[in-house]
Amino acid sequence: MNGDGEQPGPGDGAARDELPSMDLVRRTLAEARAAARARGQDPGRGFAAGPAPRRVAGRRRSWSGPGPDTRDPQPLGKLTRDLAKKRGWSGHVAEGTVLGQWSQVVGAQIADHATPTALNEGVLSVTAESTAWATQLRIMQSQLLAKIAAAVGNGVVTSLKITGPASPSWRKGPRHIAGRGPRDTYG
């Protein structure tokens, strides 16, 4: 307010908090619209434009009927598969399925006698409980790959590395260098 008791106008250099509340809102909105126009954007008119015009021709609004619809609730498994596919996690989820659901993928009998240990770059390492089972799994290798491909898709597991039970050995680790030959080990 100035000294005469008049209300300040938008052209006056008065502070914003001296304006009545609706004038302040209108002035702020006008400034925002002007800034949008300066950036080359369409500021729109908000609700002042009225409701959207009614469409006379064209497709009518479809209400959900008694049959299945895309708006119906979806199973959680389908939603997680879609999310994994959208985010690019499908390969990792498939690898986890092979390792986590081994008995459903290959069958209960094989799962009782063989355990997957690692899956690196498409090579699945499987440890059998006996050398006989390791030999049997090597014979069935193509059938196992077909079962795995049917469960999780092609290309997830490209080959199998089947090993028997670990026998006692002096070697440590998967790679080794030849030693100096036989020595007197036991005193």
From Swiss-Prot:
**What family does this chain come from, according to its entry?**
Belongs to the UPF0232 family.
Q: Matching HAMAP family, A to Z?
A: UPF0232
Using the UniProt annotation, give all residue ranges assigned to the region (Disordered).
1-77, 166-187
Q: List, as start-end ranges, the regions of compositional bias called Gly residues.
A: 1-12
Biased region (Basic and acidic residues) positions are 14-30
NCBIfam families to which the protein is assigned, alphabetical: PRK03195.1
The domain of life for this entry's organism is Bacteria
Question: Coiled coil located at which positions?
Answer: none
Q: Where is the composition biased (Low complexity)?
A: 31-55
What protein name does the entry list?
Answer: UPF0232 protein MUL_0004
Q: Which Pfam families match?
A: DciA
